[in-house]
Amino acid sequence: MREILFRGQSIDRREWYEGDLYQSRLKSVFFISYYTEYGDRMSVGVDSKTVGQYTGLLDKNGNKIFEGDILKQKTTPEFAKVNSFEWEHYGIVRFGYYDWDEGEAGYASIGWYIEPLKSVSIKPKNYLVGHIQAGLNQSDILNKYYPMEIIGNIHDNPELLKGGGEE
C-alpha cells in the first residue's frame, strides 16, 4: 500500500515540510503536520499553491517523488545497446487525466504521469525524439530503461519550466 504523504512550503520561512495535510475550518490556511527528530508532533502553515502529494515512488537516488517535481530521464546503456540511440526527457510530475498515444493503440487514464517539457537526442545528435508522456504506474519499465532523477520542482526552480535541464 502506498504511503499517503504531502509536501508544502511554509508560509513564513519558505522551508519544505512533509507530513499529513489538513485545512483550517475557515478553509483559509493549509497545514502540514509532521514529527520532529525528537518525536514531537508539530504543524506549520503552508502555501496552498505549493502542496503536492507523494507518488509512492523514489527517484534513482532514493529521493521521494512528489507532485510538482521536475524529473530528468536518460536512457540506460542497456536501452541504448538494443535500440542504438540515446536521449533525455524532462518533465513535471502531475496527477490527473492523461491520454497516451491517442490512436487505437493508446489509452487514457487518471493517475500520476509525467507532463513533457523537453526531449533531447544524445546519440545520434539529429535523431528525432518525441515526447514521452508516461503514467507513473509504469515505473518498473521507466526505471529499467530511463530512470527518473529529481532535478528540481516547479516552485523553487521555475527556470526549468522553460525546457528542463541545460542544453
State the predicted function of each range.
Residues M1-E167:
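Secondary-structure transition motif
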